[in-house]
Design a protein with these regions (language model features):
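A compositional/structural signature for long, glycine/proline-rich flexible linkers
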Residues: 1-400
Length: 400
């Protein structure tokens, strides 16, 4: 992604505006893939390796590499062998891997610098890597004027209007990786649906009544997922703190589905902590037609080694969240926001509302949608006090 997300972005729910994304799906069934990330210095970055089921199984990140990442060789579950001494081996639990990179961008003037870093981030097959190394040794890299074609995955687009399409795509995906015993047991429980990994799902095998019952079950499941927001974690001061298994869900299938709906591709808490707020200090739902203030007392800013940000979202009827269009094109406020006004005691008050506030409050205004809204506070490389619950975010206060 060459530009930061804005209100038009609808590809992934709950996007952030702090980083530029780099996204790729890796097919490891036939051969390994090499990942080379350039020296990032002190800039925040993370490349999360997620399994087919969105479990984070490995990171290339500042927290672990100190800004000087080593090359990685990512291999599938059936691959035999080892890597060269100068390459770190990453073993994936599934042949399909979602690699999602995040690189901190400090406003529009910083975009070109991040574009260069993205351009130096390489994904290569063994043959591509060997060819590049030969060309580099021969100093011919600069003469290569025709870049290799981008690989294209032969995957059909999911038809959201057809509930059976999920079975079709899902069984194809499951057929490309060996299943663990836990997932095999789940599929056995679903035997009446005739779901077989790698086999085409045939809805014609069911009667009209059976197809109707399946559609009803899918609709009920979606309602259950949307209604499971309290499953996200403990709620303190109106803020929902993530469960410890965020990003590595195990057999917590409802939590996995909830995160896929409202926070797809979430990192583990040690890499980034996501705190969600949907209610004010009196447990009333947040609505942009009201006026709110979030006040951080002096010395009580969110503790994060990398950075923190507070993002405003418009909530769709199905529970997803996206940026809201606003006259100042501001979607988040954080520790890098220029021009914030602090109190004489060092406190910070952020004003949350749809209507334009008084001029004296404009510097700290985070525009809200005209209806239901959601706040997400992100802390990248969070401090232990945030992870263990010693530090708590203050409640959002409604101004009547």
């Amino acid at each position: 992604m060459l530009f930061r997300s804005d209100h038009r972005a609808r590809a992934v729910t709950t996007p952030n505006t702090d980083t530029l994304y780099s996204s790729a799906w890796l097919d490891l069934a036939a051969e390994p893939i090499f990942l080379t990330v350039p020296d990032m210095g002190q800039r925040y970055y993370s490349f999360a390796c997620m399994s087919l089921f969105t479990d984070n199984f490995a990171y290339v990140c500042r927290r672990l590499d100190g800004g000087k990442p080593r090359p990685r060789m990512i291999v599938g579950p059936s691959w035999k062998g080892d890597s060269d001494a100068d390459v770190e081996l990453i073993r994936a639990p599934t042949n399909s891997v979602w690699l999602l990179g995040r690189i901190l961008v400090d406003g529009p003037p910083d975009l070109e610098t991040v574009w260069v870093l993205q351009g130096k981030t390489l994904l290569e097959t063994p043959d591509m890597r060997n060819e590049r190394r030969i060309l580099e040794m021969q100093e011919l890299m600069r003469q290569r004027t025709v870049p290799p074609p981008d690989p294209v995955a032969d995957w059909p687009a999911l038809n959201r209007d057809d509930p059976f399409d999920l079975f079709e795509v899902g069984m194809r995906a499951l057929g490309e990786s060996p299943l663990g015993e836990r997932d095999k047991a789940v599929l056995e429980d679903l035997a009446p649906l005739r779901l077989r990994p790698g086999r085409k799902f045939d809805q014609r095998a069911f009667s009209d009544a059976e197809r109707g019952a399946i559609k009803t079950g899918i609709a009920r499941a979606r309602d259950e997922i949307r209604g499971a927001s309290r499953q996200w974690g403990a709620i303190v001061n109106g803020w929902t703190y993530p469960k410890n298994n965020l990003g590595n869900f195990g057999d917590d299938y409802l939590y996995r589905a909830l995160v896929a709906l409202s926070g797809l591709a979430a990192l583990e808490p040690a890499e980034a902590t996501y705190l969600t707020c949907n209610t004010d200090q009196d447990h009333r739902g947040l609505d942009g037609k009201q006026r709110y203030v979030l006040r951080f007392p002096p010395g009580q800013m969110p503790p994060a080694k990398a950075f923190w940000s507070l993002t405003m979202y418009d909530v769709t009827p199905d529970g997803r969240a996206f940026f809201t269009d606003n006259p100042i094109s501001r979607y988040a406020i954080g520790d890098r926001t220029k021009g914030l006004q602090y109190g004489a005691d060092g406190s910070l008050e952020i004003h949350l509302q749809h209507e334009r506030p008084a001029e004296a409050l404009m510097a700290n205004w985070l525009p809200a949608p005209a209806g239901p809204m959601r706040l997400v506070l992100r802390a990248y490389e969070p401090a232990p006090s945030l992870l263990d619950g010693t530090y708590r975010i203050p409640a959002v206060r409604r101004i009547d």
